[in-house]
A protein has these predicted regions:
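Cleavable N-terminal export/targeting peptides
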Residues: 1-23
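Outer-membrane beta-barrel biogenesis signature
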Residues: 15-39, 45, 58, 298-301, ...
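Transmembrane beta-strand segments of Gram-negative outer membrane beta-barrel proteins
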Residues: 24-54, 82-85, 171, 210, ...
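Surface-exposed loop and membrane-interface regions of Gram-negative outer-membrane beta-barrel proteins
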Residues: 49-67, 75-127, 140-148, 186, ...
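Signature for the C-terminal beta-barrel architecture of outer-membrane proteins
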Residues: 127-131, 148-298, 337, 350, ...
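Outer-membrane beta-barrel transmembrane domain signature
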Residues: 325-329, 333-385, 391, 405, ...
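Outer-membrane beta-barrel "beta-signal"
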Residues: 386, 418-431
Length: 431
């Protein structure tokens, strides 16, 4: 009871500061030192999400609570120098799954560890180059290839060095090299420099119509036998540039070596939407996503698109059964804002595998849902996702969602084919 009252008091205090439009209470030394805190709690219920088999109850057919606490400090002694450090504690409570992150699908426990620690040098008002080095978040485009995976309770960061050139009118170009940080429940989270991820990424506003992004990415992983390039472009219309219409698209090709095999792969998505002139701002969108699969796992060629370091939860259904590889996904998006602080959305996805000779991989782009079966139908199933988000104040949000997966012919031909359900309720306090 006391903990609930304490939480309520913290939320009330945070919101009252915003409503009163006071200065940031976490800002010290005339803004040169800023403290931050984020507390996120998510209740989840999952049934048949991993095996699509209602006849065999597993430790993943259960409910649990995910807690995440982040504490950070930002210090800016001069306009051209910034330091930032952030610690994170992640816990999975009430689950029978292993405590180790990733084991049997578990979010796992990762007791207070260093999530970010970086410094940034440069003042764009004086010189157009800045350098950011240390443990940091990398996020580009709509996170289909590079993102922090923030839905995951531990999330993702990189030990990286990033040089950015700042041009005019929102133009910028990044050059970076990095290694992803691997969570270690029993010790300090560290990166593995046997895996090096580098890239050149440019953001180019175009004729006040769209944002155009061009990139060249390279992943070298000596443990996995990877050494390949990803060349691509991401396009997104600017707000109201086309009136009520909007669009977004991305195209990427890969070449090199993946898993010791010659890689030739492709991925793309195209989305268009229309927002009606109504106080609730209803939007209807249609999206198609495609990632190549591998037609013959036994030969020396690899045709499956390598999904790199994405946040796939945002794109291919909330149950997280798919990645941007060996995939056809047609999705209908509906959203409305009945109130300024309330957003509701409904999505319906229909999924096919690109090639049934290849594995169906989950959202982490690695874990197989089922072994390949070339003789099976490529229709995997469909998914309905309903989400509701309410912003109590700038510092506090409440979100809830329900998803149902309708099992398709591929599941029926390869084993159990029960439908799956996912339900969550999440709160996020941040200031």
């Amino acid at each position: 009871m006391n903990s609930r009252l304490t939480t309520f008091a913290v939320v009330l205090t945070a919101c009252s500061h915003v409503l009163a439009e006071t200065d940031n209470p976490m800002s010290l030394a005339e803004g040169r030192v800023v403290l931050g805190i984020e507390l996120q709690t998510r209740f989840e219920f999952r049934d048949n999400n991993f095996d699509f088999n209602s006849a065999a109850g597993t430790i993943n057919d259960d409910s649990w609570l995910l807690n995440r606490l982040r504490l950070n400090v930002k210090v800016q002694p001069t306009p051209w120098m910034t330091f930032f450090a952030e610690g994170q504690d992640s816990q999975e409570i009430g689950s029978q799954r292993p405590d180790r992150p990733g084991a049997l699908g578990a979010e796992g426990d990762n007791t207070f560890d260093l999530r970010q620690a970086w410094f940034e040098l440069g003042d764009v008002k004086s010189f157009p180059l800045t350098l950011k080095a240390g443990r940091q978040v990398l996020l580009y485009g709509d996170q289909r290839l590079i993102g922090p995976l923030d839905w995951n309770n531990i999330s993702r960061t990189f030990d990286a060095a990033k040089l950015r050139w700042h041009g005019r009118d929102g133009l910028w170009v990044d050059l970076f090299t990095s290694s992803v940080v691997v969570p270690d429940r029993g010790g300090f989270d560290e990166s593995n420099w046997n895996s090096v991820f580098s890239g050149l990424y440019a953001h180019i506003p175009t004729l006040e119509l769209q944002d155009t992004e061009l990139y060249v990415l390279h992943l070298r992983d000596t443990n996995l036998g990877h050494a390949f390039f990803t060349f691509g472009t991401h396009l997104k219309s600017q707000p109201e540039a086309l009136g009520s219409w909007d669009y977004e698209a991305e195209f990427a090709v890969q070449t090199g070596r993946a898993g010791g095999r010659d890689l030739r792969a492709f991925a793309s998505y195209v989305e268009g939407g229309y927002t009606f002139d109504h106080p609730w701002k209803p939007r209807v969108g249609l999206e198609y996503s495609y990632g190549t699969g591998d037609g013959n796992p036994a030969d020396g060629d690899q045709g499956a698109f390598q999904n790199l370091f994405p946040t796939n939860h945002l794109h291919y259904g909330l149950i997280d059964a798919f990645s941007w590889s060996n995939l056809h996904d047609v999705a209908l998006h509906l959203s409305v804002k009945p109130m300024a602080k309330l957003t509701t959305s409904l999505e319906f996805h229909v999924f096919w595998l690109d090639d049934t000779a290849d594995t169906w991989r989950r959202a982490n782009a690695a874990t197989p849902v089922r072994a390949a079966n070339p003789a099976a139908s490529n229709y995997a199933g469909s998914e309905l996702d309903l989400t509701v988000a309410y912003t109590v104040c700038d510092s506090f949000r409440v979100m809830a969602g329900y998803s149902h997966f309708f099992a398709g012919d591929y599941l029926a031909a390869t084993g159990a084919s029960s439908d799956a359900d996912f339900l969550y309720l999440m709160t996020n306090l941040k200031f």
